[in-house]
């Protein structure tokens, strides 16, 4: 059995969008809606007074969605973890559209909970099928 995690870095983002909780809220809503994820409670946000950067966390029935923004560097870091394999979200297109990101890097990790052979009758993608990958979109 395995889950999948996306670690995303967007660079060259518009600083003002990285300081806007409403913009980040729309991003979270879009990802959650598109992937049919199930939030558990309200997303929590913290804005840092000195830089305006924001940290956000949404607890999901499937695991979590988190972000950290660094407007002083024009960067946004996202982490989405789902405890079962699923299709990903188009982070490259979405982050370029919403935050005017100049570049987006996505690392996809398979989080292997147990060896597939330990669960009779269950076939889950192994590391050879969904190997950790990095790409720039």
Segment roles from a protein language model:
Residues 1-137:
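Polybasic/polar functional segments that serve as interface/processing modules
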């Amino acid at each position: 059995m395995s889950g999948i995690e996306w670690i995303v870095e967007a660079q060259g983002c518009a600083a003002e969008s990285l300081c806007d909780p409403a913009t980040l809220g729309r991003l979270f809503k879009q990802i959650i809606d598109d992937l049919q994820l199930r939030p558990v409670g309200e997303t929590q946000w913290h804005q840092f007074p000195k830089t305006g950067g924001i940290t956000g966390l949404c607890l999901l029935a499937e695991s979590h969605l988190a972000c950290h923004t660094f407007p002083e560097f024009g960067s946004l870091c996202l982490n989405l973890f789902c405890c079962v394999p699923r299709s990903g979200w188009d982070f490259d297109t979405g982050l370029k559209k919403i935050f005017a990101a100049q570049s987006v890097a996505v690392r996809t990790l398979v989080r292997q909970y147990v060896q597939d052979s330990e669960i009779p009758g269950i076939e889950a993608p192994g590391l050879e099928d969904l190997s950790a990958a990095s790409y720039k979109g």
